[in-house]
Amino acid sequence: MATIALPWSLSLYVFLLLLATPWASAAVKNCSHLECFYNSRANVSCMWSHEEALNVTTCHVHAKSNLRHWNKTCELTLVRQASWACNLILGSFPESQSLTSVDLLDINVVCWEEKGWRRVKTCDFHPFDNLRLVAPHSLQVLHIDTQRCNISWKVSQVSHYIEPYLEFEARRRLLGHSWEDASVLSLKQRQQWLFLEMLIPSTSYEVQVRVKAQRNNTGTWSPWSQPLTFRTRPADPMKEILPMSWLRYLLLVLGCFSGFFSCVYILVKCRYLGPWLKTVLKCHIPDPSEFFSQLSSQHGGDLQKWLSSPVPLSFFSPSGPAPEISPLEVLDGDSKAVQLLLLQKDSAPLPSPSGHSQASCFTNQGYFFFHLPNALEIESCQVYFTYDPCVEEEVEEDGSRLPEGSPHPPLLPLAGEQDDYCAFPPRDDLLLFSPSLSTPNTAYGGSRAPEERSPLSLHEGLPSLASRDLMGLQRPLERMPEGDGEGLSANSSGEQASVPEGNLHGQDQDRGQGPILTLNTDAYLSLQELQAQDSVHLI
């Protein structure tokens, strides 16, 4: 019996639950007479209207968030017949962000009846799905003309979540006309200014603006703003008197041309005006003579001469024909043998006994000194040669010459002095120079202390090439056999002791048969003189 009673009681419980469920869902979802809007910041405005007659004196709206621990309440006030409204203040400041898009509010309408408070309406509210912003404010005229006007406005209490989705509408009307006849202008972007055109001059207008957040197509337009009244400017009276504007431009152009030609005529005819203009337009340039008194007195106050080049222009142009430069001979490194210092047999004609000598033949081979790996190493002799071509003159005066068949004795330097000479390639007109003749080798002089020799002067004559004593002094060691080294040293020292220095010059003067090379001192030029003669062919 107990087992039959349990299923009967369970079925009765389920039946009662099914009956109660539709009533509860209807109480939650029935929001037809209650409208609430969120201004995206800290305010929820609600309006409640009912059809049935309720004997109530006071009603309130209660709001509770599912994510926040607060309850807000506002009292409904009668706005019009059977309509009540109130504002739920959610934050302490109007610009505070009180809700987000995930908040859900439970809103209830409770009224006081004779027996107590009774819940009349219950509704779930999603704030960001029911947005209605505050109406724009601070409308002002930025620029006004006869037919145009520029107007701006501001918006407030707008959340940063919906700022990119704002759009506006504006309407205008003639003062005294109805708003239903006004034209509406749509601004689909966040543009807080409006440029009105094609207005009537000297006419009064009124403008209103509203805003909406176009987010998920659920936004609602805000209320219209307070109307802005303005009046356009009257028409220009000059345009009515002179409607042809091109005539004014023509008169302006003619006036400019006449003024220009008048100024030119005055400047040409007035000869005293030029100095006056120079005085007026002159910039203050300081006098350099006040700061450089020495230079000013040296050049007589001539600034152009002071600033000019100290070298005349004629210095940079060649004054005569370009000299002929003889070819440069380059030898291989293997030719650095003793043959470079040998004189050929027919090197120079014999001098005359009268003391006159022929013109020396010089080349420019000693002017170039190369220090390359395989080149001939030459000590830098401070001797410069002219670039004149070689000219040989035969002495026509009476004098004896060597017979054609007589051989020239070779002039060889000592082994210790070979590096002191400026070595040149063998030529018919070769002339040897040495800055300083070094001391003879100890192999020639034994243990005798070396004596310094002074360099040959340009005005002194060279020793005779045919002097056999001098040839004996300059005979190289490498020409002697290997076993005669000691004998050569003894003979050399003996000859040096037996032959005095003055005897060498005496023998050269007594003999007139040895060839003598007399230096041509006119052929030697310093580097500055060479550059002064021909500055174009500088090396």
UniProtKB/Swiss-Prot annotation:
Compartment(s): Cell membrane; Cell surface
Protein name as it appears in the record: Interleukin-2 receptor subunit beta
Subunit-structure text: Non-covalent dimer of an alpha and a beta subunit. IL2R exists in 3 different forms: a high affinity dimer, an intermediate affinity monomer (beta subunit), and a low affinity monomer (alpha subunit). The high and intermediate affinity forms also associate with a gamma subunit. Interacts with SHB upon interleukin stimulation.
GO molecular function, one term: interleukin-2 receptor activity
Protein species of origin: Mus musculus
Gene designation per UniProt: Il2rb
Segments forming domain Fibronectin type-III: 135-235
Cellular component GO terms held in the UniProt record: cell surface; external side of plasma membrane; plasma membrane
Chain positions covered by the region annotation Disordered: 395-419, 440-465, 477-516
